[in-house]
């Protein structure tokens, strides 16, 4: 698919965050070419006046105003919430690198999330960040399933990226997101990667909006043995599977001294944060 790319002027790259673990968020782009079938960020079209399908366009943000050091000093900053800041267009436009060049002089807690090995291009800057975590999304070791779900870097490249970052002294997080019931084998992933991963994050698959029927249709055709389970969770709304899995993950990580955070109840965490504002 040919991407529609456009440069757009913005007043500020930094916005307040409703995410439970960050104060501010920076999205260098609007849109993303990864084409993740489960992407929650497709809701952004409502605010950007795009008629094109999500995954078919990318806006490259241009901002003449430097990032405010005073605003971010001592705060937590997330790159990025509704795009992959290292999507393939970053190689051409270098927005994320320019942002990092400003952030390295700010005493803030920086979290970068990506599915791309392109982040290794900026390892020189990453090593200058004093309080940095880099999370790479991996929810399967099956390349075919990954290819069915997104167009981002291969699983092999993502794992190599985590290992290279770890070897360079950068704090690594494997973000197991989204966890697909009956498909994501969290133990298998941990066993394979624990040597070079400092922390694991877990987030469950939420199905809503335009992509719900697409994913349920995929399960019906590719994994018919899981149809009953998905119907129980996503049609009937039974949370028992997630409650049981959360306990199981907690017990496994405790038994193996694995540092982790469970974001299964992300919606509840966001709502709790909003109530404190």
PLM features: residue spans?
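Conserved Radical SAM active-site core
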Residues: 1-133, 141-144, 155-156, 167
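Auxiliary Fe-S-binding modules of radical SAM enzymes
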Residues: 2-9, 15-16, 187-277
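Structural preference for beta-strand elements that scaffold enzyme active sites
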Residues: 76-78, 109-111, 131-135, 171-175, ...
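Active-site beta-loop-alpha junctions enriched in small/polar residues
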Residues: 82-84, 115-117, 137-141, 177-179, ...
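Surface-exposed cleft-lining segments at the edges of enzyme active sites
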Residues: 85-87, 143-151, 171-177, 236
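Anion (oxyanion) recognition and catalysis
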Residues: 104, 166-167, 194, 254
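Glycine-rich S-adenosyl-L-methionine
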Residues: 152-164
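Conserved strand-turn element in the central/C-terminal portion of the radical SAM core barrel
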Residues: 164-184, 236-239
């Amino acid at each position: 698919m040919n991407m529609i790319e456009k440069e757009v002027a913005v007043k500020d790259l930094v916005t307040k965050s409703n995410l439970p673990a960050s104060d501010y968020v920076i999205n260098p782009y609007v849109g993303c070419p990864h084409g993740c079938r489960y992407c929650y960020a497709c809701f952004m079209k409502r605010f950007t006046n795009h008629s094109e399908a999500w995954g078919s366009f990318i806006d490259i943000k241009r901002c003449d105003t430097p990032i405010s050091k005073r605003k971010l000093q001592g705060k937590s900053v997330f790159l990025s919430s509704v795009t992959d800041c290292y999507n393939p267009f970053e190689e051409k436009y270098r927005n994320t690198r320019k942002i990092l060049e400003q952030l390295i002089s700010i005493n803030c807690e920086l979290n970068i999330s990506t599915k791309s090995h392109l982040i290794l291009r900026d390892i020189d800057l990453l090593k200058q960040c004093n309080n940095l975590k880099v999370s790479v999304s991996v929810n399967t070791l099956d390349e075919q399933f990954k290819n069915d779900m997104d167009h981002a870097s291969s699983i092999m490249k993502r794992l190599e990226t985590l290992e290279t970052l770890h070897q360079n002294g950068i704090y690594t997080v494997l973000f197991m997101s989204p966890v697909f019931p009956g498909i994501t084998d969290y133990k298998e992933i941990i066993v394979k990667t624990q040597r070079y991963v400092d922390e694991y994050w877990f987030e469950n698959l939420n199905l809503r909006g335009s992509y719900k029927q697409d994913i349920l249709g995929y399960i019906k055709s590719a994994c018919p043995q899981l149809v009953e389970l998905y119907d129980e969770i996503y049609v009937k709304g039974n949370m028992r599977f997630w409650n049981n899995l959360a306990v199981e993950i907690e017990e496994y990580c405790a038994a193996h001294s694995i540092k982790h955070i469970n974001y299964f109840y992300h919606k509840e965490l966001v709502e709790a944060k909003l109530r404190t504002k």
